[in-house]
């Protein structure tokens, strides 16, 4: 049985409002359309992946999202923005942000019940995948940012991880308290 790990945070904004935040690696949420960047395991006609498998994975992921029931959820390993929108259709999550490199099979997303006031993408230099997504929120006159990232795997080398870490540190350094 696969165990789903989600890290849930609750933050207090100016000690007045409570906002719950989670992060969830959906572990390759793909549709059944070939856009050319899929992993081989998710190519229809080449693997066991088909529309039925894609719909089943979408429904199971939607159940986890609904069970989390947080205000904001950062998501990793989503194929495209259309899959992200399908995931939250008919839900309380009305706002989505997404980033993906053209050559990457998966991207990062954020879904929210709160309307973001902006977003920014940080490209990790010399790494073909794994942008860092920053989504900005404002509530009760206070701004806060959520950074969504998914560092390269260790098998790709520690240097790629260090580049991602440096990019995130630089982005965080630009934040005002």
Regions found by a protein language model. Give the residues of each.
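Second-shell loop/turn segments in exported
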Residues: 46-52, 69-75, 98, 121-122, ...
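Short, solvent-exposed loop/turn and secondary-structure capping segments
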Residues: 32-35, 85-87, 121-123, 147, ...
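Phosphate/oxyanion-binding active-site loops and adjacent basic polyanion-contact surfaces
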Residues: 53-57, 125-129, 160-164
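Structured beta-strand-rich core segments of catalytic domains in phosphoester-bond hydrolases
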Residues: 78-143, 151
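Sec-dependent N-terminal signal peptides
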Residues: 3-15
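N-terminal, active-site-proximal structural segment of metallo-dependent hydrolase catalytic domains
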Residues: 15-90
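Extracytoplasmic, non-cytosolic globular domains
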Residues: 133-177
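Loop/turn elements at helix/coil->beta-strand transitions in domains of secreted/extracellular proteins
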Residues: 17-20, 68-72, 92-95, 117, ...
